[in-house]
Amino acid sequence: MSIHMAQNAFARCAEKVNTRKNLTLNRQAVGEVVSYCTMIAANDTLDFNRDKQERLCTEMNHRAEVYTVEMSAYGQPKAREKLRERTAPMLDKPFVLPAGQYPRKQREKDALAERRAAGDLVIRFFIEALDSMGYDRAQINSTVEEARKNYEQFLEWAKDGE
């Protein structure tokens, strides 16, 4: 193997590691933004006060912990399936995180898939939290739609550099 081939192989491996690291950071950042969008949506549509905001946050964290335990017990695919089974009956239509720009390259498509997976998890924790707080299907759906709109607004601000 020539030195040039070895350097190229090393560069490809380093790029893969950086891509995985970036996807993980991307997933975490989107999860945080979607969490903020849900909190704002709950405040706007359900007229939350500080106590309800704190309870919602606690309930969402609890649902995330339940999911983590299920992942450890059953593996990620089965844990996701169980989460979808619990939350799907409460949704009128599937939640799909807005894309912003259409992805052209494979790494952009991978990043969008990661963002959508993170957004899906947060929204499902949000749905379970609202359900446990006694909100009905119509209230949950209107609040989820408001959270989606909030995320679209965030994308506009990000595009404008605000």
Specify the residue positions occupied by each region the protein language model found.
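Amphipathic alpha-helical segments that form the core helices of the histone-fold
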Residues: 56-67, 143-152
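Hydrophobic, well-ordered secondary-structure scaffolds
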Residues: 38-39, 55-57
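Intrinsic disorder/low-complexity detector
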Residues: 1-41, 66-126, 153-162
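Extracellular/lumenal glycan-associated surfaces
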Residues: 41-42, 46, 128-129, 133
